[in-house]
Amino acid sequence: MKYELTATEARVIGCLLEKQVTTPEQYPLSVNGVVTASNQKTNREPVMNLSEHEVQEQLDNLVKRHFLRTVSGFGNRVTKYEQRFCNSEFGNLKLSPAEVALIATLLLRGAQTPGELRSRASRMYEFSDMAEVESTLEQLAARDDGPYVVRLAREPGKRESRYMHLFCGEVDEPVSSDDAPQAASGDLHARVEALEGEVAELKQRLDSLLAHLGD
């Protein structure tokens, strides 16, 4: 697979995929917008503290690799960036809205269970049930031009296996365990994080609106 991203590149692309869907009025993003999204404390694992210089470096590299493109002119006072990672006019990687939501969430948070993914991706796509989440993951794992995700061995005490994207290379699978499954709070925790993410998005929109009114 030709997609081989660093952890920071994965974070930047994940942010652009997310914001393209959740805050289309603020998309494409400026460098400052990408910095804010990359260092966001909600729906990010791990939480990063990237500088503007570090983000600019990643953006320049991704533009050279044709994963992003710059947008300027037409009233834009600053250069902005939009993703060409998937679903671009001349790109080869085509993803459905459900697949975009899962890939973006995996790029932003790493390995997760289907239940966690359903909750955390809900702002980008509303899955009808767990079966739709699992079937979409299996499709991504079985694609002829992929695979793009892999199912990991179940961790001790967990009821669900986790899935991980393969855009940063192969994943070392943890040792499988036959321990009896225990009731886990992962899904509840994911739902709380999804709500926190919505609050953060609303705050960001409000700040943007207030800044616009102040101009």
Swiss-Prot record:
Species in which this protein is naturally found: Citrobacter koseri (strain ATCC BAA-895 / CDC 4225-83 / SGSC4696)
Family that this chain belongs to: Belongs to the UPF0502 family.
HAMAP family recorded: UPF0502
Source species, domain of life: Bacteria
InterPro entries, sorted: DUF480, WH-like_DNA-bd_sf, WH_DNA-bd_sf
PANTHER family: UPF0502 PROTEIN YCEH
Protein name: UPF0502 protein CKO_01995
